[in-house]
Amino acid sequence: MKHRTLPGLLSTALILSLCTLPASALETEDTRMLLETYYVDEIPQEILNLDSTEAILEALNDPYTVYMSAEEYQAFLNQVDGETVVGIGVSIQNAVDDGVQILSILDNSPAQEAGLSAGDRILAVDGVTLTSGMDPSTLIRGEVGTSVTLTIRLHSTGEEKDFTLERKAVTIPIVTYDLVDGDVGYIACDSFGASTSDTVREALEEMGDDANLWVVDLRSNPGGTDTAVTLSLGWFESGVMVYMMGRDGLAYYRAIRPDAPDLTDVPVVVLTSPWSASGAEMFAAAVRAHHIGIAIGQRTYGKGVAQTVLDEDSSNGTIAELFDGDCLKITTYRFYAPDGATNDTVGVLPTLLISQGNTEAAALLLRSNEPSIANGSLKLELAGFTFYIDESTARHADNRDAFTELLEALPPSAKLYRGSGGSTWTEMTPAALAEELGLDFTSRMFSDVSDSPFADAINTLAVYGLVSGYEDGTFHPEETITRAEFASMVASALDLRVPEQSYFSDVAADAWYADGVNAMAAKGFFAGDGSVFRPDDTITYEEMV
């Protein structure tokens, strides 16, 4: 694989779009030229032949490749860089089908006060249905004190409801930090913008002498610019942070210089959610690959593509002349973690899979310094790190549920010890410890796989919710499963998107398993036998794992 440093023009990985398809001042022939030059994949000629920028972008069906007017582009930059704006306080992303999806909600904003949540979908604004070709930002924004009515499909229930919100000026806080419990450096990063790396460095320097653990909260971070890489400064030693592959097949890379200062050797715990996307996923994957910490939370959004913003400041003068305050944001790269893994569609799986309600509390139970006396403490060896947990704190009513779920989330590779006396550590299983402490513990592992040579692999997948068994807690490892059932199970577990293409001649388009088989094939998980998949052939559950 060839490597080159990433040129300045192509170094931006922006994700949020505040618009759908506004009327474009960009000439259609210029849109064609830019897409043919920079888009990550070859675009069918019938799409490029369409008669307007709006039609081309709509047919492309890429929610990340968008045109922004000057007003919309400025609003986008305000959101990324942390400015004060008038609105309802949400970051949104175009949906592939209908409406726009809320990715995060600002504290003390009208949206938060109304009870909206990340994952909710805005279907209409003041009775105007949001469809392709419409700009939701111009409908949502307005004067301070005026009202706007949103039709929302609630993520939690699927119910559609109207919410009337009063617009107000909201400041978009990119990074905030605080020393929690006297020894945890807590850094909340809601976006990657121009000031992010400087503020994070400030946090590391200010709290570094006291921090026994770093927590970086990316749960509301939908990405931003490529400062996800510069955010890494201070934790990482030199090395590649991300590979980005464009349509030319060359792998560009972003790296930390060998002379970059290392401000801390204290491990970092990254908090993730389904709304952590793009640069947030890039950072979480780099933390894992470079072994400087772990992640706790839920699987991330799964945006493994990066965008280039072409505007009047583009280094290519010919391109810059095409714009006057507006821009065209184009998907130009697929990005990969330093270990070669992609998060596209599948997301980044955290080290500990913890529910949203318990994520923060579980992380705050961990410490990196060994206590002077073992008695009353727990030692956890996980993913190459050793953490310590104060038992009385973990058993407190405020932390009991989070602690129980942390024990349930431990994979087979983790080792758990209970301290006694001055320096004695006795290994225990999470289930045994939970029983001694009277916790309401439910094992995610299977009760009938201990004799299988694949027991650890099976139980690891079970802990991360990637395979399921029977209601009685068994897996039946020697039973068989068809290839069609296997494909459908894994595609569902990974939440793979269904492609339009059919890959195998023996998989009918209307077969119940067709979506799963084609989704797996599109991601390259298997290729079948020539053009034949053999959906009815069987494998055992063990072989499946």
Each language-model region and where it sits:
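Sec-dependent N-terminal signal peptides of Gram-positive bacterial secreted proteins and lipoproteins
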Residues: 3-25
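Feature responds to low-complexity, polar/acidic, surface-exposed segments characteristic
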Residues: 5, 418-453, 468-484, 491-516, ...
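Interdomain regulatory linker/hinge segments that flank or connect interaction modules
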Residues: 27-80, 149-151, 156
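PDZ/PDZ-like peptide-tail recognition elements
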Residues: 63-104, 164
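PDZ-domain C-terminal substructure recognizer with occasional recognition of PDZ-binding tails
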Residues: 101, 123-125, 136-176, 331-332
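PDZ/PDZ-like domain micro-motif
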Residues: 107-121, 173-176, 543
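Conserved PDZ fold ligand-binding element
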Residues: 111-132, 215-217
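C-terminal "post-core" interaction segments
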Residues: 179-442
